[in-house]
Amino acid sequence: MVKNIPVFKDNNSKLAIIAIHGWKGNRSSMEHVANALNIKYAQWTFIQGPYAAGDNKYSWFEGNEEEGWKYQESFDLLHKTILDINKNGFPKSKIFLLGFSQGACLAM
C-alpha cells in the first residue's frame, strides 16, 4: 500500500521534477538540490522511500540476498506520483525524474 504523499511546491510550472532521495534520506533530503539547481518554471515533488532505515531515514529497497528484496511499494509510489502529476495537468513528456544514489537506481 502506498503510504507516502508527494509534496508539491510550485503552482506556475511548465515541467515537473520528481526528486528521489538516496539511501537513508527522506523527502527533505533533495530540497537543497532543487534550490541549488534553481530551475525556473519547475514544480518539484519530493517523495520518500517506504522502507524504514533508521530514525527519519528511509530506503527504496529492503531485504538481502538470502531472504529476497522488497521494492514493490517503491515502484507503486513512483507510478502513483507520475499519474497524480499527469492528472494535475502535466503531460508525461514534461515529467522528469531526478535521483541521488539509490534514488537514481529507482529512477532508471
Q: What residue ranges belong to the model's regions?
A:
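Gly/Ala-rich beta-loop-alpha elbow adjacent to hydrolase catalytic centers
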Residues: 98-103, 107
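Short glycine-rich phosphate-binding loop at a beta-alpha junction
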Residues: 94-96
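Short, hydrophobic alpha-helix immediately C-terminal to the catalytic nucleophile
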Residues: 31, 107-108
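Serine-hydrolase catalytic machinery in alpha/beta-hydrolase-like enzymes
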Residues: 2-11, 15-92
